[in-house]
Amino acid sequence: MLRVRCLRGGSRGAEAAHLIGALVGRALSGRLSRASRSSSSSAAAQLPLSAHEQVPEPTAEECPVCAHNEWDPLEEVIVGRAENACVPPFTVEVKANTYEKYWPFYQQYGGQTFPKEHVQKAVAEIEEMCNILQHEGVTVRRPEPVDWSLEYRTPDFSSTGMYAAMPRDILMVVGNEIIEAPMAWRARFFEYRAYRPLIKEYFRRGARWTTAPKPTMADQLYDQDYPIRTVEDRHKLAAQGKFVTTEFEPCFDAADFIRAGTDIFVQRSQVTNYMGIEWMRRHLSPTYKIHIISFKDPNPMHIDATFNIIGPGLVLSNPDRPCRQIEMFKKAGWTVVTPPTPLIPDNHPLWMSSKWLSMNVLMLDEKRVMVDANESTIQKMFESLGIKTVKVSIRHANSLGGGFHCWTTDVRRRGTLQSYFL
């Protein structure tokens, strides 16, 4: 039987905010007392703040950002954009995360836009997805359009950009805090810029905002000799805990983490290293516990098409990539569901992902799920679980590397912080 424990006081952010507010208040009081000795300083201290300068502290009742898990009723969501999407240059970290049959595509088109007609179809699909989300009562927000074809240079590398299609990769909401992830692909170095207007708005309205240490992405972050010619090579290396990213500096994609209240599960992957996981552990403790889990996966990158938590004590577990720690979940009373084989045809291009995007679903609440209209078998699986399916077709959007979970970041879900893993 699944055990659930409610925590008093909401998220850790509220406590921290009040403590910081008190400390800042004392500091300001001392400063103003000293400043009163000077007439000029006193006058300056009495100047009122403009509306734009007044930034409120977050409260659980009013904060526009609040999510504790993957299934509470969804109220607001960021949905990515396919516009201007560019093929990333074929660097070692891209090679390690893509299938060999697509390597000629990257070699030919790296730095250029994805096929125009395909992107146009993806844009139309995501627009329809947004319309359906709004029809289901969810507020939809979008990142800014950006020209990703522009080349940029840092002291360590040069690259063109990629897209702002997958907010799940870069943004993670934990309680009332938005965390910007220090992603590992050089083509995604400036992706955060598309989301900054939204994040600043949420911050001004009371959300907490944290940016993890930005990696330099110097050559030392990548194993330049990483052997990835065959799937067998990848299986052996992953089993040995060896990946294309080194431990030179912290890096992680937010999509390698998945939330279940006070417990957050993460995998070490091609884009998330142990330093990145340790940074998150220290940042979120003691309220949240980070659990590292692993899978029989030759190409680990993003957990949500391998292990997708869809309800309290309910998880989809990919049969092709079994979780090595699955008994831990069963002992905790969780129900482990094996999704059916995806129906996506072999000839459909999936430049950055596998067919298992069929299980990369978005829960609107415990009893509603957004699922691909073409995947009839997984629809039946959800219906057998008593979950209503909201059907949308995003086949062309899938080609850019994500399903419904990838294409979104849930900004606000109505619920409280609880423990589901005791």
From Swiss-Prot:
Pathway per the UniProt entry: Amine and polyamine biosynthesis; creatine biosynthesis; creatine from L-arginine and glycine: step 1/2
GO biological process, one term: creatine biosynthetic process
First-tier enzyme category under EC: transferase
Expressing tissues: Strongly expressed in neurons and glia of the brain, the lamina propria, submucosa and serosa of the small intestine, in oocytes and on the fringes of the pancreas. Not expressed in the retina, eye lens, heart or bulbus arteriosus. Expressed in the yolk syncytial layer in gastrula stage embryos, in the yolk syncytial layer and mature somites in early segmentation embryos and in the yolk syncytial layer and the liver of long-pec stage (48 hours post-fertilization) embryos.
Gene Ontology CC terms, in alphabetical order: mitochondrial inner membrane; mitochondrial intermembrane space
Cross-referenced InterPro entries: AmidinoTrfase
Domain of life, per lineage: Eukaryota
Gene3D superfamilies: L-arginine/glycine Amidinotransferase, Chain A
Coiled-coil segments: none
Keyword field: Membrane, Mitochondrion, Mitochondrion inner membrane, Transferase, Transit peptide
Reactions the enzyme catalyzes: L-arginine + glycine = guanidinoacetate + L-ornithine
Active site: residue positions: 253, 302, 406
Major localization class: mitochondrion
Molecular-function annotations in GO: glycine amidinotransferase activity
Protein EC: 2.1.4.1
Subcellular location: Mitochondrion inner membrane
UniProt similarity note: Belongs to the amidinotransferase family.
Function: Catalyzes the biosynthesis of guanidinoacetate, the immediate precursor of creatine. Creatine plays a vital role in energy metabolism in muscle tissues. May play a role in embryonic and central nervous system development.
Subunit and interaction comment: Homodimer.
Name used for this protein in its record: Glycine amidinotransferase, mitochondrial
Organism for this UniProt entry: Danio rerio (Zebrafish)
Classification lineage: Eukaryota, Metazoa, Chordata, Craniata, Vertebrata
